[in-house]
Amino acid sequence: MKVMPIVVAGAKFLQDYSKSRALDYGAGTGRNSIYLANLGIDVMAVDQDIEELEKLAINNKMIHPVKADLRDWEIQGKFDLVVATNVLQFFDNDTATRCLNDMTNCLNSGGVLCLTYILDKKFFLPVGFEEILTSKFKMINSETKVIQDPGHPDFPEPHQHKIFYFLGIKK
């Protein structure tokens, strides 16, 4: 899978890749981690299943896999970039809002947040998100798009997703 365009856009706001740290929150297969590490960014890639991430880390010393259940994981350290693509919608509203707040708090001032959130019949943007995003970030981009998904292991048939995209700089 290819890197998400919002991650490419977000990385451009970093001043010096070689001195930057990124948190890939819910890294999955590592598609965003690989892109960031190849830029020279030090990446903490966190997911509950890190088998694929560990394989990537063998060949790329900039990727540091961490096995964790994000619903109760305490973020350690500060970051210049936080990436959370299509992960928070799987949590209940209170947990998703707390996780977004934790991600905000681990960002350095001027740090970049790249967030995507699937919206559909099951998933709605949690009430607390708007308050956090508008009060803590200078918005670079915020939009909702419908995308075509060719299918994946959980749902192999082609289908669409409505996705909320947010790119912001921490105030």
Cite the ranges covered by each PLM segment:
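Class I (Rossmann-like) S-adenosyl-L-methionine-dependent methyltransferase catalytic domain
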Residues: M1-L23, G28-E74, F91, T95-R98, ...
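A conserved beta-strand element that flanks and buttresses the S-adenosyl-L-methionine
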Residues: V83
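Short catalytic micro-motifs in class I SAM-dependent methyltransferases
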Residues: N86-V87
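A short glycine-rich, Lys/Arg-flanked "PGG" loop and its adjoining helix->strand segment in the class I
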Residues: T97-S109
